[in-house]
């Protein structure tokens, strides 16, 4: 019987290798900066999610060091035992006030926050409607939940409308991302919010890639479209330059999650020093508009310099997909760019649909205009 696991593991690995879809981890130095180092060689880094450049900010590092001196290294327990401290409470109240919802509940990752909501909220007889391109954390939780999950075509409001009409008699939760991580496009949140309200459904928005980057003072996609969802997910590994996540909702829903969301109840709380640093990151996001202004300038430059490159998608975000098609071709381009000192990542199935393998370029406020030109010139020449 023990051999069955070995055979299963070996077979899965071999299939992925034969399909050219095997992925590997690379040990990097300074991976949170505009330049990273791998095996002693420097590369311009166009693969991270540190959009505002906070991850390497000395100001933010000093805030975390201050938190360490005040609160020590770890929280020591789960939130409902003794792991919930003043920095956690402060961060939650600051997030709720900033984003205009009653309360916030902290989680250790966006993946766990998404799964916690779906696993704790949905019951048998409920309907879950998800955008087809939602994150793996949402899709996995939906498939494993007792609810009936249906997927609507990407950003297709008419398809969602038809699904809502069919599920009008059941409690229904509609889930979409604010910014889609592989395409860099925005969800039509105003239309979706209107539909959910008309059909007495709840709306959940995962704004992992929008919060901090878009909207007034970085409030994210919901601010862009002037909506307030029933549940809002924000994560701290992108615009905030750190890690972790929060679920924002009304007070009663927050009380419910603090009792029944197992990812929250049974996980050690994030270090209080981290929560302290996140409060400072929030202040930087609110006050340092120059970071978003610079991103806009770099975005315009990137799209202008690749305007004639087939497959370069225009987006209103720092996520710039370059659609190649076949996975092997995407890998070849990524490797060729690395030879020129440009670190990009080839995104292949199953992360994206078959036939849509791509180079996923991400921009950061830490990049310079010269960095962008180096990348676009290489892409134009190699493509």
UniProtKB/Swiss-Prot annotation:
What's the protein name? Answer: 8-amino-7-oxononanoate synthase
Question: Which E.C. number(s) belong to this protein?
Answer: 2.3.1.47
Q: Where does pyridoxal 5'-phosphate bind?
A: 110-111, 181, 209, 235
Q: Per UniProt, what is one Pfam family of this protein?
A: Aminotran_1_2
Query: Gene behind this chain?
Result: bioF
Question: Which InterPro entries does the record match to this protein?
Answer: Aminotrans_II_pyridoxalP_BS, Aminotransferase_I/II_large, AON_synthase_class-II, AONS_Archaea/Proteobacteria, AONS_Proteobacteria, PyrdxlP-dep_Trfase, PyrdxlP-dep_Trfase_major, PyrdxlP-dep_Trfase_small
Which family does the similarity line name?
Answer: Belongs to the class-II pyridoxal-phosphate-dependent aminotransferase family. BioF subfamily.
Which interval of the chain is the signal sequence?
none
Residues recorded with modification N6-(pyridoxal phosphate)lysine:
238
Function, as annotated, reads: Catalyzes the decarboxylative condensation of pimeloyl-[acyl-carrier protein] and L-alanine to produce 8-amino-7-oxononanoate (AON), [acyl-carrier protein], and carbon dioxide.
Q: Needs which cofactor?
A: pyridoxal 5'-phosphate
Might you name a Gene Ontology BP term for this protein? biotin biosynthetic process
Which residues are listed for substrate binding in this entry? 23, 135, 351
- What is a GO molecular function of this protein? pyridoxal phosphate binding
The reaction(s) this protein catalyses: 6-carboxyhexanoyl-[ACP] + L-alanine + H(+) = (8S)-8-amino-7-oxononanoate + holo-[ACP] + CO2
Task: Give the EC class as a word.
Answer: transferase
Task: List the pathway annotation.
Answer: Cofactor biosynthesis; biotin biosynthesis
- HAMAP family on file: BioF_aminotrans_2
Q: How does it assemble?
A: Homodimer.
Which keywords appear in this protein's UniProt record, sorted alphabetically? Biotin biosynthesis, Pyridoxal phosphate, Transferase
What SUPFAM superfamilies does the database record attribute to this sequence? PLP-dependent transferases (SSF53383)
């Amino acid at each position: 019987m023990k051999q069955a696991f070995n055979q299963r593991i070996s077979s899965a690995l071999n299939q992925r290798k034969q399909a050219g879809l095997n992925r590997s981890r690379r040990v990097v130095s300074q991976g949170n900066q505009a330049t990273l180092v791998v095996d002693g060689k420097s590369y311009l880094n166009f693969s991270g999610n540190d959009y505002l450049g906070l991850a390497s900010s000395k100001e933010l590092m000093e805030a975390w060091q201050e938190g360490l001196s005040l609160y020590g290294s770890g929280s020591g327990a789960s939130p409902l035992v003794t792991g919930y401290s003043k920095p956690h409470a402060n961060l939650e109240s600051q997030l709720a006030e900033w984003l205009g919802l009653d309360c916030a509940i902290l989680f250790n990752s966006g993946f766990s926050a998404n799964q916690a909501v779906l696993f704790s909220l949905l019951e048998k007889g409920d309907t879950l409607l998800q955008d087809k391109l939602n994150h793996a954390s949402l899709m996995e939780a939906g498939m494993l939940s007792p609810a009936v999950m249906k997927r609507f075509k990407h950003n297709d409001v008419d398809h969602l409308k038809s699904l809502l009409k069919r599920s009008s008699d059941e409690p229904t939760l509609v889930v979409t991302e604010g910014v889609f991580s592989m395409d860099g496009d925005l969800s039509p949140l105003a239309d979706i919010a209107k539909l959910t309200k008309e059909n007495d459904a709840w709306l959940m928005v995962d704004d992992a890639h929008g919060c901090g980057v878009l909207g007034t003072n970085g409030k994210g996609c919901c601010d862009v479209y002037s909506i307030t969802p029933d549940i809002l997910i924000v994560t701290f590994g992108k615009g905030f330059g750190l890690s972790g996540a929060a679920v924002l909702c009304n007070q009663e829903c927050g009380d419910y999650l603090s009792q029944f969301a197992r990812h929250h109840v049974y996980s050690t709380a994030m270090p209080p020093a981290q929560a302290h640093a996140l409060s400072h990151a929030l202040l930087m996001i609110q006050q340092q508009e120059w970071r978003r202004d610079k991103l806009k300038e770099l975005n315009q430059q990137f799209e202008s310099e690749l305007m004639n490159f087939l497959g370069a998608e225009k987006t209103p975000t720092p996520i710039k997909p370059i659609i190649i098609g076949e996975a092997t071709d995407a890998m070849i381009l990524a490797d060729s760019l690395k030879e020129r000192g440009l670190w990009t990542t080839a995104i292949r199935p199953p992360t994206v649909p078959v036939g849509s393998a791509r180079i996923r370029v991400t921009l950061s406020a830490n990049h310079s205009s010269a960095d962008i030109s180096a990348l676009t010139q290489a892409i134009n020449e190699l493509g």
